[in-house]
Amino acid sequence: AEPEQFCPLNTKVGHTFFLVDFTSPLKKAQVDWITGRIFGDSLIKTIPPYHKISYMKIDDTKVQSQEILFTKCRAKTGNKSQFPGEKTNDKCEGHDRIIKLHDAFAFLSSKFEKEFMANYELEASKSLIFEYLFHVLREPVSDFTSEYPVRELVIASDLMQYGKRFSFYSHCKTNLELSKPNKCKSFE
């Protein structure tokens, strides 16, 4: 495996891509909900070993300029789990080495989680959610191609697009409310 990426050298097993919307300020409860589903133990329980994991923010950055902020393959734990190949194969793998790699992966992903979820109270001037979605699906730089037999795109967003060409907010607001660029009245 590539030491910095934890990925197998000659195969692509699967790819889970997390696209997280930071265009509206998030409340602490929303941050907790997001982190509880896309980081830490949740990754180990829901994503098989050696599947690639990538994270990208939806924010004020131009879609073509946005970078994938973290991309690594999930290291195996060495313990038995629901996933085939998770347990150390004593015939050809060293258990201590597997544990060391998993600990390195866990440390890097924990450090990244803190960086990624910082500044969750900022507000963007636009929300080009669908452009980001198309970018991930179409652009080779995302490495979200059919070369992976299993692909999953996870979008953490209210899916409320707003930009110059198209805005959901203009369809759900009165003229007086249009002064608030990314707020929509309650649907209750």
Go through the PLM ranges and name each one:
Residues 5-8, 72-74, 91-93, 171-173, ...:
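Sequence contexts marking disulfide-bonded cysteines in secreted/extracellular proteins
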Residues 10-12, 147-148:
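Short basic/glycine-enriched coil/helix segment immediately N-terminal to the Walker B
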Residues 33-42, 135-138, 180-187:
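N-terminal post-signal-peptidase region of extra-cytosolic proteins
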Residues 160-188:
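VWA/integrin I-like adhesion module and closely mimicked acidic/polar interface patches used
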